[in-house]
Amino acid sequence: MQLFPVMLATLCIVLQLLIGSSALATTNRHVSNSHWLPAVATWYGSPNGDGSDGGACGYGTLVDVKPLHARVGAVNPILFKNGEGCGACYKVRCLDKSICSRRAVTVIITDECPGCSKTSTHFDLSGAVFGRLAIAGESGPLRNRGLIPVIYRRTACKYRGKNIAFHVNEGSTDFWLSLLVEFEDGEGDIGSMHIRQAGAREWLEMKHVWGANWCIIGGPLKGPFSIKLTTLSAGKTLSATDVVPRNWAPKATYSSRLNFSPVL
C-alpha cells in the first residue's frame, strides 16, 4: 500500500507552500490547568482491550505494547488540538462513590474521537482503562453505564527507561522526510520541530502534517540529522544531536540519549 506515504508527502508539500502563522510562536503558551476539571467519558473496543488500533496520532503498533499498552485514549477536538495534543497525558477519575475508585487512571492521548461531544471535554477510553476507574468487582457494571461524568487534569508523561525516539515514516526519501515523535516525557505534546542537516548551522522548520507526524521537503537532505523539539504547552526546548544517522532508512526508529524532565 503506497497510498499512505503519498498522502503524507502531498500534505507536506501543501504545508510547505502555506504562508501564515508559524508553529514556532511561543507567546501565550502555558501548561493546561493542573486543577481538576469536569468532563465525560465513554469506552470502546473489547471490555478488557487496549482500545485504539493505532489511532489518529499515528503511533501504530506502539499502542499495543508497553509503556502505552492499555493506557491509551481518544479525545474530542478540545484536547486533540488538530493533532498537537497527541502524546499529552491526563489523570482521569470518575465521581460516583458507590462504584468509582478514588484512584485516578493515567491516559495517554493517541487518538481522536470524531463522534464525541464537540462542546464539552470528552474522553473515549479503552475498555481496560475505563474498567480501572471502578472499585474492585465493579468494572463490568461501570462499563454498562456507557457514558459517565468524570474529572480530569493534566499530568506529566513518564516513560521509565525510555528516551525520545524518532520514527522515520514509510515513503521518506532524500527529498521528503517525515518523522514521528515517540516517548516524550513531561508535557508530551509538540508545538514545533526543527531539523539540522550534516555540516549545517541553520535549523530548518518542519511542518506538522497530522497527529504526531512532522515533515520537511528539500533536497537532497543530508544526514546525520539533529532534531530540535519545542513543547506546545510551555515552549520547553530540547535538541538531539545527530540522532538520525547518515544511513537512515524508512520505517526505522532512532532513539536519542535524552528526554524532557518528567514534570510539568
Curated annotation (Swiss-Prot):
GO biological process per UniProt: plant-type cell wall loosening; sexual reproduction; syncytium formation
Pfam families per UniProt: DPBB_1, Expansin_C
All copies of domain Expansin-like EG45, residue ranges: 54-162
Gene Ontology CC annotations of this record: extracellular region; membrane; plasmodesma
Keywords assigned by UniProt, alphabetized: Cell wall, Cell wall biogenesis/degradation, Disulfide bond, Membrane, Secreted, Signal
Domain Expansin-like CBD, chain residue ranges per copy: 175-256
Disulfide bond positions: 57-86, 89-157, 94-100
Subcellular location: Secreted, Cell wall; Membrane
Membrane topology reported for the UniProt record: Peripheral membrane protein
Signal sequence region: 1-25
Domain of life: Eukaryota
Gene3D superfamilies given in the database record: Expansin, cellulose-binding-like domain, RlpA-like domain
SUPFAM superfamilies hit by this protein: Barwin-like endoglucanases, PHL pollen allergen
Chief place of localization: secreted
Protein's UniProt keywords contain Magnesium: no
Classification via InterPro entries: Expan_Lol_pI, Expansin/allergen_DPBB_dom, Expansin_CBD, Expansin_CBD_sf, LolPI, RlpA-like_DPBB, RlpA-like_sf
Cited function: May cause loosening and extension of plant cell walls by disrupting non-covalent bonding between cellulose microfibrils and matrix glucans. No enzymatic activity has been found.
Family: Belongs to the expansin family. Expansin B subfamily.
Descriptive protein name: Expansin-B3
